[in-house]
Amino acid sequence: SLFPTRNDTMFIPIRIISNKFIESYMDKIRFKNNMTYFPEQNYKSFLKNKNSKGVFVLLSDVRKPDGDKITFFGLPTTNSGFPAYFSKKENIPIVIIHNEVDENNICHIFIDKVIHPENYKNRHEIMKSILTEYEKIILKLPEQWFWFQDRWRDGI
């Protein structure tokens, strides 16, 4: 199945937070939810688990100054192409999901699209498809999207 069960391990690269209280809280959440995590720069450790049973969680809407040049909302920026690279290299589908909070403050999770890497020529086409989906999601409820303030910094 493409979708995790409560018993599946989740593998996720993370950025360590400098606030020790928040990082401690996040560690408890990761442990409780059966997450195996790696510092985001340590993809070699992440890849060592590629044949493990579990779910690989990769965030795609992250600006990387030295990342792939892409267009997002019609403007040039950069992006980590790692999810597309990993998907294409290992022939692993990408499941695009997002959450919405309703008027009662209840969070609903939606599965938007499953991207099968064999249907794309290269990782750049996969990233373009991912970001096209993100644009649709964001335009639906822009007030609920977490924006990075430097998304279009430096005019790339």
For the regions a language model picked out, list residue spans one by one.
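Catalytic core of membrane glycerolipid acyltransferases/transacylases, capturing the structured
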Residues: S1-Q41, P65-I70, L75-P76
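Non-catalytic C-terminal accessory region of glycerolipid acyltransferases
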Residues: R6-T9, K44-I156
